[in-house]
Amino acid sequence: MASTEIMTVNMGPQHPSTHGVLRLVVELDGEIIQKITPHIGYLHRGVEKLSEHRTYHQTIPLTDRLDYLAPMHNNLGYVLAVEKLLGIEVPERAQTIRVILAELTRLKSHLVWVACHALDIGAMTVFIYAFREREMVMSLYEKISGARMTSSYFRVGGLSSDVYDGFEKDVREIVDTFPGHFDTYEGLLTKNTIWLNRTVGNGVISAEDAIDYGITGPALRGSGVDWDLRRDNPYSGYEKYQFKVPVGEKCDTFDRYKVRLVEMREAVNIIRQALDSLKPGPVLADAPQVTYPPKENVYNTIEGLIHHFKIASEGFPVPEGEVYQGVENPKGELGYYIVSDGGNKPYRMRIRPPSFVNLGAIEKMAKGSMIADLVAVIGTLDIVLGEIDR
Amino acid sequence: MAETNRAVIKLREKFSASVLDVKEFRGEVTVTVKREDIVEICNFLKSSLAYNLCTDVTAVDYLGKQEPRFMVVYNLYSIPNKDRLRVKAGVPEAGCSIDTVSCVWSAANWLEREVYDLMGVVFNNHPDLRRILMTDDWVGHPLRKDYPLQGPGREPYKGRLS
């Protein structure tokens, strides 16, 4: 019998499907994967360390750089955790706008996922279409916050400002046109023979293994586990909205693809319901120790000016204690664990990154399959290296 | 409410000697246990109380604030019961180690490697305890409180951040 030799191949960090700085050292027997050793790159923004040296408000711009595809979700998890520590209640209008923007962000993130996943496997058209649609959400971001990517729009206690006139019209235009676009993607991919051959039965991970590896989000639901934080641990008033939580059956790449596409349709549903329930009202909590005073007070009264200055430079004290807040990010459960010692800075802030934990299961998912299928497995996890390496 | 929590009652029943403290803050229950029994307790929480998802493993450095210096924190979630629980175990600076729970949840494998890398807590019997975010030859553990923000061997910047 011919003897076989194991070959070691470096995949990444420049490989187009490793999305940035991921390097996989793959040991191959022919084309079959025997072992994968991930080296998850050295981005090192040091967000956790930096946040120990900044006030609670100053940390917000650090959080949306974690996962640059879903900045508002990262803001949301952080401000919810700080609000929980403080024990303050956010007004209803702010909560509804937060939900609308969070779901738009989910669309934005999933659009990049479907684009890049399809491109990794070799479908170019979907990439161009999805980025075209994402542009609509991006310009909405720009109108709201002035930034196309890193919005930093949410504040502890509510929003940095109310939305502009015509916001509802713009959002309605998005929710009215997007379902048609989803049909286009499905038309291009769902029954495409090449797509099916590359995704069905690829990257299988059973429900039990997926939970064991701590996988969350669409990747877990693709394995048939019916679990969604928005429904099971509701925050920001998600309990008021009706939506389906899609789950897969075969636990493979195709199921995770289907789950994310249904999730996009459900996001449109949630945005519609939230728009219908949007009423006028304040967008900042009645907590003057924590929130910035209204601009007219800052400009016209000395007390307002001093107060604004104090909050901006010194921050605000937060009661001693520790909380954990998880939110359902497009990638999975993003959690903030904050320990406060009573000061104006987090004593310790830990970010529970979904991509990091999901990537931990890559060997389990890809072992024994062909190296060409590894590309599809990386794509189906929808990783963002900025979040993995924080 | 912490005293009526199902997990707390069961843990007190079964591990009365190892439960050091039970606290509730903003509706979240935290149980502090002895580090020697962490694997046994986690096994019990997973198999008998259905805390099947190990959401997070992390550590807090209480340098000069309290003894023991490190607190290893396990954020657990039960998918069937939709219930969260936080378990903590203190680890002293001398003999800075605790047993691994990666035999209970595979998710703990990478999370513990990160704690080891950034905090310097050693996990006994861990299958693959290597640095994960920093390079292999990196000196020091960046998330420790005595590790300077600007990095080692640099004159601290005297401006806003330092």
Curated annotation (Swiss-Prot), chain A:
Taxonomy, superkingdom: Bacteria
Keyword tags: Cell inner membrane, Cell membrane, Membrane, NAD, Quinone, Translocase, Transport, Ubiquinone
Enzyme Commission code(s) on record: 7.1.1.-
Pfam families noted in UniProt: Complex1_49kDa
One Gene Ontology MF term: quinone binding
Reactions catalysed: a quinone + NADH + 5 H(+)(in) = a quinol + NAD(+) + 4 H(+)(out)
A single cellular component GO annotation: plasma membrane
Top-tier EC class: translocase
Compartments, record wording: Cell inner membrane
Membrane-topology descriptor: Peripheral membrane protein
Recorded family membership: Belongs to the complex I 49 kDa subunit family.
Role description: NDH-1 shuttles electrons from NADH, via FMN and iron-sulfur (Fe-S) centers, to quinones in the respiratory chain. The immediate electron acceptor for the enzyme in this species is believed to be ubiquinone. Couples the redox reaction to proton translocation (for every two electrons transferred, four hydrogen ions are translocated across the cytoplasmic membrane), and thus conserves the redox energy in a proton gradient.
Quaternary structure note: NDH-1 is composed of 14 different subunits. Subunits NuoB, C, D, E, F, and G constitute the peripheral sector of the complex.
Official protein name in the record: NADH-quinone oxidoreductase subunit D
Lineage of producing organism: Bacteria, Pseudomonadati, Thermodesulfobacteriota, Desulfuromonadia, Geobacterales
UniProtKB/Swiss-Prot annotation, chain B:
Enzyme class, broadest EC rank: translocase
One Pfam match: Complex1_30kDa
Residues making up the signal peptide according to the UniProt record: none
Catalytic activity: a quinone + NADH + 5 H(+)(in) = a quinol + NAD(+) + 4 H(+)(out)
Keyword entries, A-Z: Cell inner membrane, Cell membrane, Membrane, NAD, Quinone, Translocase, Transport, Ubiquinone
Subcellular location: Cell inner membrane
Its job: NDH-1 shuttles electrons from NADH, via FMN and iron-sulfur (Fe-S) centers, to quinones in the respiratory chain. The immediate electron acceptor for the enzyme in this species is believed to be ubiquinone. Couples the redox reaction to proton translocation (for every two electrons transferred, four hydrogen ions are translocated across the cytoplasmic membrane), and thus conserves the redox energy in a proton gradient.
Family: Belongs to the complex I 30 kDa subunit family.
Name this protein carries in UniProt: NADH-quinone oxidoreductase subunit C
Gene behind the chain: nuoC
